[in-house]
Regions:
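Outer-membrane beta-barrel proteins
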Residues: 1, 36-42, 53-55, 80-84, ...
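Residues on the lipid-exposed face of transmembrane beta-strands in outer-membrane beta-barrel proteins
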Residues: 2-6, 15, 50-58, 69, ...
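Outer membrane beta-barrel strand-and-loop segments of large Gram-negative receptors
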Residues: 5-66, 75-87, 91
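Repeated loop/turn-to-beta-strand initiation elements of outer-membrane beta-barrel proteins
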Residues: 8-11, 60-65, 102-108, 139-144, ...
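Structural signature of outer-membrane beta-barrel domains
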Residues: 9, 16-20, 59, 70-74, ...
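Outer-membrane beta-barrel translocator domains and adjoining extracellular loop/strand segments
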Residues: 21-30, 74-83, 117-124, 157-163, ...
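C-terminal beta-barrel architecture of Gram-negative outer-membrane proteins
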Residues: 69-74, 89-137, 149-152, 160-161, ...
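C-terminal beta-signal and adjacent terminal beta-strands/loops
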Residues: 137-207
Length: 207
């Protein structure tokens, strides 16, 4: 694993090798049309990943852009599984923070993830856009938030799991589209720390 950070830019890359990984697999029960799930040891699996994150500041506008690359390789030797070839997955995220005033802030989060094959599950691409507004009162002690998630109803759950001589699929919407409101109160806005009276110093010195 390699991590490099310079000012508002960070880079991360890594490689994992797992010997005898436990993988969730669908199996036919006694050759009948009955499928059950179980964990099975495979020979080995490998993962590679790269991530770049940029979080500059432009006065009242604070963006955070992230690009991720991941790819997994599972050895299925000895199993009757007809899964697609391994392919890379890319994840794009853009978090936008707008400091409209000292007490009013707006957040716009956009995310897109390409299709990927992880172990035995192939997941299709999905996207999501969220928006949020916060307003603070009483010197930031009271914070009111209003949010809306998955504005365009694009965060769908679509996957195919390849098992031992069988295939399972799911294509649906998880009903993540919603609006809501939050209210929070911060009891220690000054971030003061209680230092104590030193009553335990004698015991600590003894130990």
């Amino acid at each position: 694993d390699l991590n490099v950070v310079y000012d508002w830019l960070s880079f991360n890359a890594g490689y994992n090798y797992i010997d005898k990984p436990m993988v969730w697999i669908a199996t036919l029960y006694q050759g009948k049309d009955i499928t059950f799930m179980r964990n099975v040891n495979f020979n080995h699996s490998k993962d590679v990943y790269v991530s770049i994150v940029a979080s500059p500041r432009f006065g009242w506008y604070n963006p955070m852009a992230e690009i991720d690359y991941t790819q997994s390789f599972l050895c299925i030797d000895g199993f009757d599984i007809n899964k697609p070839t391994n392919r890379p997955c890319f994840n794009f995220r853009l978090n936008n923070r707008f400091n409209i005033t000292s007490t009013l802030k707006a957040f716009l989060t956009m995310r897109y993830k390409t299709s990927r094959l992880y172990d035995l599950q192939y997941s299709k691409q999905f996207a999501q856009v969220d928006v949020k507004f916060t307003k603070s009162f009483l010197n930031d002690a009271l914070v009111l938030g209003v949010y809306a998630n998955d504005l365009f109803k694009t965060d769908k759950e679509r996957w195919t799991m390849y098992g031992n001589r069988n295939v399972m699929t799911k294509d649906c919407y998880g009903y993540t589209r919603c609006v809501g409101m939050t209210l929070s109160y911060n009891f220690n806005t000054a971030k003061s720390t209680y230092k104590g009276t030193g009553a335990g110093n004698t015991e600590k010195n003894r130990l």
